Protein backbone atom coordinates (compact mmCIF):
# COMPACT_ATOMS: atom_id res chain seq x y z
CA UNK A 1 0.00 0.00 0.00
CA UNK A 2 1.46 3.37 -1.03
CA UNK A 3 2.06 5.86 1.74
CA UNK A 4 1.01 9.49 1.28
CA UNK A 5 3.90 11.78 0.33
CA UNK A 6 4.49 15.06 2.18
CA UNK A 7 6.97 17.48 0.60
CA UNK A 8 8.56 20.48 2.30
CA UNK A 9 9.29 23.31 -0.13
CA UNK A 10 10.58 26.82 0.24
CA UNK A 11 13.64 28.94 -0.34
CA UNK A 12 16.97 28.29 1.33
CA UNK A 13 17.53 28.81 5.05
CA UNK A 14 13.89 28.90 6.13
CA UNK A 15 14.30 25.72 8.21
CA UNK A 16 13.16 22.92 5.88
CA UNK A 17 15.79 20.43 7.02
CA UNK A 18 15.16 21.23 10.67
CA UNK A 19 11.46 20.50 10.25
CA UNK A 20 12.26 17.32 8.32
CA UNK A 21 14.49 16.08 11.13
CA UNK A 22 11.80 16.83 13.71
CA UNK A 23 9.14 14.97 11.73
CA UNK A 24 11.18 11.79 11.29
CA UNK A 25 13.14 11.86 14.56
CA UNK A 26 11.10 9.21 16.37
CA UNK A 27 11.17 6.92 13.36
CA UNK A 28 14.95 6.65 13.01
CA UNK A 29 16.15 3.13 13.74
CA UNK A 30 18.91 2.62 11.20
CA UNK A 31 22.13 0.66 11.63
CA UNK A 32 25.26 1.36 9.67
CA UNK A 33 24.92 -1.76 7.53
CA UNK A 34 21.22 -1.26 6.84
CA UNK A 35 20.77 -1.86 3.09
CA UNK A 36 17.65 0.30 2.93
CA UNK A 37 17.56 3.53 0.97
CA UNK A 38 16.43 5.60 3.95
CA UNK A 39 19.97 5.90 5.29
CA UNK A 40 20.38 8.89 2.95
CA UNK A 41 17.86 10.84 5.01
CA UNK A 42 16.47 12.49 1.87
CA UNK A 43 13.13 10.73 2.20
CA UNK A 44 12.02 8.94 5.33
CA UNK A 45 8.96 7.52 6.96
CA UNK A 46 7.13 9.58 9.58
CA UNK A 47 4.16 8.71 11.76
CA UNK A 48 1.47 10.65 13.56
CA UNK A 49 -1.51 9.03 15.29
CA UNK A 50 -0.77 5.68 13.62
CA UNK A 51 -0.82 7.26 10.17
CA UNK A 52 2.37 6.70 8.22
CA UNK A 53 3.65 8.88 5.42
CA UNK A 54 6.83 9.64 3.50
CA UNK A 55 8.49 13.00 4.08
CA UNK A 56 10.67 14.45 1.33
CA UNK A 57 13.49 16.72 2.45
CA UNK A 58 14.48 19.45 0.02
CA UNK A 59 16.80 21.02 2.56
CA UNK A 60 19.89 20.27 0.53
CA UNK A 61 18.86 22.59 -2.26
CA UNK A 62 21.07 25.49 -1.31
CA UNK A 63 21.82 27.61 -4.38
CA UNK A 64 25.36 28.92 -4.82
CA UNK A 65 24.46 32.20 -6.47
CA UNK A 66 21.54 34.61 -6.57
CA UNK A 67 21.12 34.05 -10.31
CA UNK A 68 19.98 30.45 -9.90
CA UNK A 69 17.82 30.85 -6.79
CA UNK A 70 14.56 31.38 -8.65
CA UNK A 71 15.26 28.56 -11.11
CA UNK A 72 16.02 26.07 -8.33
CA UNK A 73 13.00 27.02 -6.25
CA UNK A 74 10.70 26.79 -9.26
CA UNK A 75 12.01 23.33 -10.12
CA UNK A 76 11.69 22.20 -6.52
CA UNK A 77 8.10 23.42 -6.35
CA UNK A 78 7.14 21.84 -9.67
CA UNK A 79 8.48 18.49 -8.51
CA UNK A 80 6.60 18.77 -5.23
CA UNK A 81 3.36 19.55 -7.05
CA UNK A 82 3.94 16.56 -9.33
CA UNK A 83 4.81 14.05 -6.61
CA UNK A 84 3.36 15.01 -3.23
CA UNK A 85 -0.08 14.52 -1.73
CA UNK A 86 0.43 17.34 0.79
CA UNK A 87 2.82 20.28 0.34
CA UNK A 88 4.26 22.18 3.29
CA UNK A 89 5.21 25.63 2.00
CA UNK A 90 7.73 26.98 4.48
CA UNK A 91 8.58 30.65 4.99
CA UNK A 92 10.69 32.65 7.45
CA UNK A 93 8.53 34.42 10.04
CA UNK A 94 11.34 36.74 11.08
CA UNK A 95 12.35 37.84 7.61
CA UNK A 96 8.85 38.27 6.23
CA UNK A 97 7.61 37.78 2.67
CA UNK A 98 10.25 37.86 -0.07
CA UNK A 99 9.83 38.02 -3.86
CA UNK A 100 10.78 34.34 -4.09
CA UNK A 101 8.06 33.47 -1.56
CA UNK A 102 5.57 35.32 -3.74
CA UNK A 103 6.69 33.39 -6.82
CA UNK A 104 6.42 30.01 -5.12
CA UNK A 105 3.00 30.95 -3.72
CA UNK A 106 1.80 31.85 -7.19
CA UNK A 107 2.76 28.39 -8.46
CA UNK A 108 1.19 26.58 -5.52
CA UNK A 109 -2.11 28.43 -5.72
CA UNK A 110 -2.65 26.95 -9.18
CA UNK A 111 -2.35 23.35 -8.02
CA UNK A 112 -5.16 21.17 -6.75
CA UNK A 113 -2.86 19.58 -4.17
CA UNK A 114 -3.28 20.35 -0.47
CA UNK A 115 -0.96 23.20 0.53
CA UNK A 116 -0.26 24.22 4.12
CA UNK A 117 1.67 27.43 4.75
CA UNK A 118 4.21 26.94 7.54
CA UNK A 119 5.58 30.13 9.09
CA UNK A 120 8.80 29.11 10.83
CA UNK A 121 10.96 30.83 13.44
CA UNK A 122 8.01 32.01 15.53
CA UNK A 123 9.88 31.30 18.75
CA UNK A 124 7.82 33.48 21.10
CA UNK A 125 4.18 34.45 21.50
CA UNK A 126 5.16 38.08 20.91
CA UNK A 127 6.09 37.15 17.35
CA UNK A 128 2.60 35.86 16.55
CA UNK A 129 1.68 39.20 15.00
CA UNK A 130 4.28 38.52 12.30
CA UNK A 131 2.10 35.70 11.00
CA UNK A 132 -0.79 37.84 9.80
CA UNK A 133 1.24 39.40 6.98
CA UNK A 134 1.61 35.97 5.40
CA UNK A 135 -2.09 35.80 4.59
CA UNK A 136 -1.08 38.01 1.65
CA UNK A 137 0.35 34.87 0.04
CA UNK A 138 -3.20 33.64 -0.48
CA UNK A 139 -3.40 30.52 1.68
CA UNK A 140 -6.11 29.91 4.24
CA UNK A 141 -4.27 27.33 6.36
CA UNK A 142 -1.33 28.96 8.11
CA UNK A 143 0.58 27.36 10.97
CA UNK A 144 3.14 29.32 12.99
CA UNK A 145 5.87 27.03 14.31
CA UNK A 146 9.37 26.97 15.68
CA UNK A 147 10.98 23.93 14.10
CA UNK A 148 14.09 24.26 16.23
CA UNK A 149 12.22 23.88 19.55
CA UNK A 150 9.19 21.91 18.25
CA UNK A 151 6.61 24.61 19.04
CA UNK A 152 3.41 24.15 17.03
CA UNK A 153 4.40 20.83 15.46
CA UNK A 154 1.49 18.92 17.00
CA UNK A 155 -1.11 21.20 15.43
CA UNK A 156 0.75 21.10 12.11
CA UNK A 157 0.85 17.30 12.05
CA UNK A 158 -2.87 17.15 12.91
CA UNK A 159 -3.53 19.24 9.83
CA UNK A 160 -1.22 17.14 7.65
CA UNK A 161 -2.77 13.76 8.47
CA UNK A 162 -6.27 15.18 8.15
CA UNK A 163 -5.49 15.66 4.45
CA UNK A 164 -4.89 11.96 3.87
CA UNK A 165 -7.77 10.19 2.21
CA UNK A 166 -8.42 7.00 4.18
CA UNK A 167 -9.53 5.37 0.96
CA UNK A 168 -6.77 6.78 -1.25
CA UNK A 169 -4.56 3.75 -0.78
CA UNK A 170 -7.30 1.23 -1.39
CA UNK A 171 -6.27 -1.01 -4.25
CA UNK A 172 -8.61 -2.36 -6.86
CA UNK A 173 -7.78 -5.81 -8.20
CA UNK A 174 -6.49 -6.84 -4.79
CA UNK A 175 -6.37 -10.49 -5.79
CA UNK A 176 -4.10 -9.87 -8.77
CA UNK A 177 -0.35 -10.09 -8.19
CA UNK A 178 1.35 -6.73 -8.68
CA UNK A 179 4.84 -6.74 -10.17
CA UNK A 180 6.98 -3.62 -9.91
CA UNK A 181 9.91 -3.07 -12.28
CA UNK A 182 12.69 -1.18 -10.51
CA UNK A 183 16.19 -0.18 -11.50
CA UNK A 184 18.33 2.62 -12.85
CA UNK A 185 17.36 4.58 -15.96
CA UNK A 186 18.23 3.01 -19.31
CA UNK A 187 18.52 -0.59 -18.11
CA UNK A 188 15.57 -1.62 -20.27
CA UNK A 189 12.50 -1.33 -18.02
CA UNK A 190 10.46 0.59 -20.56
CA UNK A 191 11.64 -1.68 -23.38
CA UNK A 192 10.52 -4.73 -21.42
CA UNK A 193 7.10 -3.18 -20.76
CA UNK A 194 6.77 -2.36 -24.46
CA UNK A 195 7.80 -5.91 -25.34
CA UNK A 196 5.12 -7.30 -23.04
CA UNK A 197 2.48 -4.94 -24.40
CA UNK A 198 3.25 -5.90 -27.99
CA UNK A 199 3.24 -9.66 -27.43
CA UNK A 200 0.29 -11.26 -29.22
CA UNK A 201 -0.06 -14.04 -26.65
CA UNK A 202 -0.81 -11.48 -23.93
CA UNK A 203 -4.10 -9.77 -23.23
CA UNK A 204 -3.40 -6.24 -22.04
CA UNK A 205 -5.71 -3.70 -20.46
CA UNK A 206 -4.41 -0.27 -19.45
CA UNK A 207 -5.70 0.79 -16.06
CA UNK A 208 -5.17 4.01 -14.17
CA UNK A 209 -2.40 3.64 -11.63
CA UNK A 210 -2.84 4.78 -8.06
CA UNK A 211 0.42 6.73 -8.17
CA UNK A 212 0.35 10.11 -9.80
CA UNK A 213 2.33 9.43 -12.98
CA UNK A 214 2.32 5.66 -13.49
CA UNK A 215 0.25 3.66 -15.90
CA UNK A 216 -0.23 0.08 -14.79
CA UNK A 217 -0.68 -2.72 -17.29
CA UNK A 218 -2.91 -5.69 -16.59
CA UNK A 219 -1.33 -8.64 -18.37
CA UNK A 220 -2.76 -12.12 -18.87
CA UNK A 221 0.13 -14.49 -19.50
CA UNK A 222 -0.76 -18.12 -20.19
CA UNK A 223 -3.85 -17.88 -18.01
CA UNK A 224 -2.18 -16.03 -15.14
CA UNK A 225 -3.09 -12.39 -14.58
CA UNK A 226 -0.60 -9.79 -13.33
CA UNK A 227 -0.48 -6.04 -12.94
CA UNK A 228 2.86 -4.58 -14.01
CA UNK A 229 3.71 -1.29 -12.34
CA UNK A 230 5.95 0.80 -14.54
CA UNK A 231 7.98 3.31 -12.51
CA UNK A 232 7.63 6.01 -15.11
CA UNK A 233 9.34 8.55 -12.88
CA UNK A 234 12.66 6.78 -13.34
CA UNK A 235 12.71 6.95 -17.12
CA UNK A 236 15.83 8.58 -18.44
CA UNK A 237 15.76 12.32 -18.91
CA UNK A 238 18.28 14.51 -20.69
CA UNK A 239 19.58 15.61 -17.34
CA UNK A 240 19.06 13.90 -14.00
CA UNK A 241 19.94 16.21 -11.14
CA UNK A 242 19.58 16.05 -7.38
CA UNK A 243 16.02 17.33 -7.19
CA UNK A 244 14.65 15.19 -10.00
CA UNK A 245 16.42 12.08 -8.72
CA UNK A 246 15.09 12.65 -5.22
CA UNK A 247 11.48 12.74 -6.35
CA UNK A 248 12.03 9.89 -8.80
CA UNK A 249 13.14 7.69 -5.93
CA UNK A 250 10.02 8.66 -3.96
CA UNK A 251 7.88 7.49 -6.88
CA UNK A 252 9.80 4.22 -6.94
CA UNK A 253 9.32 3.71 -3.20
CA UNK A 254 5.60 4.33 -3.62
CA UNK A 255 5.45 1.74 -6.40
CA UNK A 256 7.32 -0.78 -4.23
CA UNK A 257 4.91 -0.16 -1.34
CA UNK A 258 1.90 -1.26 -3.36
CA UNK A 259 3.56 -4.17 -5.16
CA UNK A 260 3.84 -7.87 -4.30
CA UNK A 261 6.93 -8.75 -6.34
CA UNK A 262 9.80 -6.37 -7.12
CA UNK A 263 11.88 -7.13 -10.20
CA UNK A 264 15.24 -5.35 -10.06
CA UNK A 265 16.50 -4.88 -13.60
CA UNK A 266 20.28 -4.68 -14.08
CA UNK A 267 22.28 -3.80 -17.19
CA UNK A 268 24.60 -6.75 -17.90
CA UNK A 269 27.27 -4.38 -19.23
CA UNK A 270 27.30 -2.34 -16.00
CA UNK A 271 26.55 -4.76 -13.18
CA UNK A 272 25.14 -3.85 -9.76
CA UNK A 273 25.14 -0.18 -8.77
CA UNK A 274 24.86 1.51 -5.38
CA UNK A 275 21.34 2.64 -6.28
CA UNK A 276 20.39 -0.98 -7.05
CA UNK A 277 21.56 -1.99 -3.59
CA UNK A 278 19.55 0.75 -1.89
CA UNK A 279 16.33 0.18 -3.80
CA UNK A 280 16.48 -3.59 -3.35
CA UNK A 281 17.26 -3.02 0.33
CA UNK A 282 14.05 -1.02 0.66
CA UNK A 283 12.05 -3.80 -1.04
CA UNK A 284 13.64 -6.31 1.35
CA UNK A 285 12.80 -4.15 4.38
CA UNK A 286 9.19 -3.88 3.18
CA UNK A 287 8.86 -7.66 2.96
CA UNK A 288 8.42 -7.84 -0.81
CA UNK A 289 9.14 -10.87 -2.95
CA UNK A 290 12.05 -10.20 -5.30
CA UNK A 291 13.67 -11.26 -8.58
CA UNK A 292 16.92 -9.95 -10.06
CA UNK A 293 16.65 -9.55 -13.84
CA UNK A 294 19.86 -9.14 -15.86
CA UNK A 295 19.08 -7.51 -19.21
CA UNK A 296 21.29 -6.96 -22.29
CA UNK A 297 22.89 -10.37 -21.82
CA UNK A 298 23.36 -10.48 -25.60
CA UNK A 299 26.04 -7.76 -25.27
CA UNK A 300 28.25 -9.82 -22.95
CA UNK A 301 31.04 -11.92 -24.47
CA UNK A 302 30.37 -15.50 -23.52
CA UNK A 303 33.05 -17.73 -22.06
CA UNK A 304 32.93 -20.85 -19.93
CA UNK A 305 31.15 -20.10 -16.64
CA UNK A 306 30.37 -16.50 -17.68
CA UNK A 307 26.84 -16.67 -16.27
CA UNK A 308 27.98 -18.35 -13.05
CA UNK A 309 30.71 -15.76 -12.55
CA UNK A 310 28.21 -12.96 -13.10
CA UNK A 311 25.87 -14.52 -10.54
CA UNK A 312 28.70 -14.77 -8.01
CA UNK A 313 29.47 -11.09 -8.48
CA UNK A 314 25.82 -10.17 -7.88
CA UNK A 315 25.68 -12.39 -4.78
CA UNK A 316 28.80 -10.70 -3.42
CA UNK A 317 27.37 -7.21 -3.86
CA UNK A 318 23.84 -8.11 -2.76
CA UNK A 319 24.70 -10.48 0.05
CA UNK A 320 21.63 -9.55 2.11
CA UNK A 321 19.32 -11.16 -0.49
CA UNK A 322 21.10 -14.43 -1.24
CA UNK A 323 17.70 -16.11 -1.60
CA UNK A 324 16.63 -14.05 -4.63
CA UNK A 325 16.64 -15.81 -8.05
CA UNK A 326 18.66 -14.29 -10.90
CA UNK A 327 17.26 -14.38 -14.44
CA UNK A 328 19.17 -13.47 -17.62
CA UNK A 329 17.31 -12.03 -20.62
CA UNK A 330 17.73 -9.88 -23.69
CA UNK A 331 14.73 -7.66 -24.32
CA UNK A 332 16.22 -6.40 -27.59
CA UNK A 333 16.67 -9.93 -28.94
CA UNK A 334 13.43 -11.08 -27.29
CA UNK A 335 15.27 -13.94 -25.61
CA UNK A 336 14.39 -15.78 -22.39
CA UNK A 337 11.40 -13.52 -21.60
CA UNK A 338 9.46 -16.67 -20.73
CA UNK A 339 11.94 -17.43 -17.94
CA UNK A 340 10.94 -14.20 -16.20
CA UNK A 341 7.29 -15.27 -16.03
CA UNK A 342 8.31 -18.74 -14.88
CA UNK A 343 10.16 -17.16 -11.95
CA UNK A 344 7.34 -14.70 -11.22
CA UNK A 345 4.86 -17.58 -10.94
CA UNK A 346 7.24 -19.60 -8.76
CA UNK A 347 8.10 -16.69 -6.46
CA UNK A 348 4.44 -15.68 -6.17
CA UNK A 349 3.55 -19.20 -5.02
CA UNK A 350 6.39 -19.13 -2.49
CA UNK A 351 5.19 -15.74 -1.23
CA UNK A 352 1.75 -17.20 -0.46
CA UNK A 353 2.99 -20.46 1.04
CA UNK A 354 1.68 -21.62 4.40
CA UNK A 355 3.26 -24.48 6.32
CA UNK A 356 1.45 -26.48 8.95
CA UNK A 357 2.57 -26.07 12.54
CA UNK A 358 3.35 -29.76 12.93
CA UNK A 359 5.66 -29.85 9.92
CA UNK A 360 7.39 -26.65 11.04
CA UNK A 361 8.13 -27.99 14.50
CA UNK A 362 9.48 -31.25 13.09
CA UNK A 363 11.96 -29.29 10.98
CA UNK A 364 13.02 -27.04 13.86
CA UNK A 365 13.41 -29.98 16.25
CA UNK A 366 15.80 -31.67 13.83
CA UNK A 367 17.66 -28.39 13.29
CA UNK A 368 18.16 -27.96 17.05
CA UNK A 369 19.57 -31.50 17.32
CA UNK A 370 22.01 -30.85 14.48
CA UNK A 371 23.15 -27.51 15.88
CA UNK A 372 22.22 -26.89 19.55
CA UNK A 373 21.23 -23.30 20.46
CA UNK A 374 23.75 -20.97 22.14
CA UNK A 375 24.00 -20.54 25.90
CA UNK A 376 25.03 -17.73 28.23
CA UNK A 377 26.25 -18.18 31.80
CA UNK A 378 24.94 -21.70 31.91
CA UNK A 379 21.52 -20.90 30.48
CA UNK A 380 20.82 -22.31 27.01
CA UNK A 381 18.35 -20.92 24.50
CA UNK A 382 15.26 -23.10 24.27
CA UNK A 383 12.90 -23.11 21.32
CA UNK A 384 9.54 -24.34 22.54
CA UNK A 385 7.31 -23.86 19.55
CA UNK A 386 7.07 -22.30 16.08
CA UNK A 387 4.02 -21.46 13.99
CA UNK A 388 3.36 -19.46 10.85
CA UNK A 389 1.13 -16.47 11.54
CA UNK A 390 1.14 -14.67 8.17
CA UNK A 391 1.83 -15.09 4.46
CA UNK A 392 2.85 -12.55 1.79
CA UNK A 393 5.47 -12.43 3.25
CA UNK A 394 5.67 -15.55 5.42
CA UNK A 395 6.00 -14.62 9.09
CA UNK A 396 6.74 -17.03 11.91
CA UNK A 397 6.06 -16.72 15.62
CA UNK A 398 8.69 -18.49 17.74
CA UNK A 399 8.28 -19.11 21.46
CA UNK A 400 11.60 -19.17 23.36
CA UNK A 401 12.79 -18.93 26.95
CA UNK A 402 14.84 -15.71 26.68
CA UNK A 403 15.03 -13.12 23.91
CA UNK A 404 18.61 -12.11 24.72
CA UNK A 405 19.79 -15.65 23.96
CA UNK A 406 18.46 -15.58 20.39
CA UNK A 407 21.58 -14.35 18.62
CA UNK A 408 21.36 -13.09 15.06
CA UNK A 409 23.55 -15.95 13.85
CA UNK A 410 21.19 -18.58 15.26
CA UNK A 411 18.17 -16.80 13.82
CA UNK A 412 19.93 -16.95 10.45
CA UNK A 413 20.52 -20.67 11.02
CA UNK A 414 16.80 -21.23 11.70
CA UNK A 415 15.95 -19.26 8.56
CA UNK A 416 18.40 -21.28 6.47
CA UNK A 417 16.89 -24.53 7.76
CA UNK A 418 13.43 -23.37 6.68
CA UNK A 419 14.77 -22.42 3.26
CA UNK A 420 16.47 -25.80 2.85
CA UNK A 421 13.28 -27.68 3.67
CA UNK A 422 10.73 -25.51 1.87
CA UNK A 423 10.68 -23.58 -1.38
CA UNK A 424 11.09 -19.98 -0.24
CA UNK A 425 13.20 -18.76 -3.17
CA UNK A 426 12.70 -15.06 -3.79
CA UNK A 427 10.83 -14.49 -0.53
CA UNK A 428 11.98 -12.74 2.67
CA UNK A 429 11.14 -14.56 5.89
CA UNK A 430 10.10 -12.62 8.98
CA UNK A 431 10.31 -13.76 12.59
CA UNK A 432 8.72 -12.65 15.83
CA UNK A 433 10.10 -14.04 19.09
CA UNK A 434 8.09 -14.30 22.29
CA UNK A 435 9.26 -15.50 25.67
CA UNK A 436 7.48 -18.23 27.55
CA UNK A 437 8.10 -19.86 30.90
CA UNK A 438 9.31 -23.42 31.23
UniProtKB/Swiss-Prot annotation:
Chain positions recorded as GTP 2 binding sites: 183-190, 230-234, 295-298
Presence of the UniProt keyword Ligase in the record: no
GO molecular function: GTP binding; ribosome binding
Entry binding sites for GTP 1: 10-17, 57-61, 120-123
SUPFAM superfamilies: P-loop containing nucleoside triphosphate hydrolases (SSF52540)
Source taxon at top rank: Bacteria
EngA-type G domain boundaries: 4-168, 177-352
Entry keyword set: GTP-binding, Nucleotide-binding, Repeat, Ribosome biogenesis
GO process annotations (BP): ribosome biogenesis
Transmembrane segments annotated in the record for this chain: none
Function: GTPase that plays an essential role in the late steps of ribosome biogenesis.
PANTHER family, sorted: GTPASE DER (PTHR43834:SF6)
Family recorded in the similarity comment: Belongs to the TRAFAC class TrmE-Era-EngA-EngB-Septin-like GTPase superfamily. EngA (Der) GTPase family.
Subunit structure: Associates with the 50S ribosomal subunit.
Protein name per its UniProtKB record: GTPase Der
Source organism (scientific name): Finegoldia magna (strain ATCC 29328 / DSM 20472 / WAL 2508) (Peptostreptococcus magnus)
Lineage of source species: Bacteria, Bacillati, Bacillota, Tissierellia, Tissierellales
Protein encoded by which gene: der
Amino acid sequence: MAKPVVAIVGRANVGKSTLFNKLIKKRIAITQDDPGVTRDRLYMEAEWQNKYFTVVDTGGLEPKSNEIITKNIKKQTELAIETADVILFMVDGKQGITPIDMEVADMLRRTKKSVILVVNKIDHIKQQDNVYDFYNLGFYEIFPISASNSMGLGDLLEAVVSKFDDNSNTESDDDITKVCLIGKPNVGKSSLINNLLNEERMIVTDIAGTTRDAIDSKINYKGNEYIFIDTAGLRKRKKIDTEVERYSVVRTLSAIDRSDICVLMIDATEGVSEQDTKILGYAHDQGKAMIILVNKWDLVEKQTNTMNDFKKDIRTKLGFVMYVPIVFISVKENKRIDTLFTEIEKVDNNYSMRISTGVLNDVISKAVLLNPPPSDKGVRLKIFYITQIEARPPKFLVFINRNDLMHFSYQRYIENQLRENFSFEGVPLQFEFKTRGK
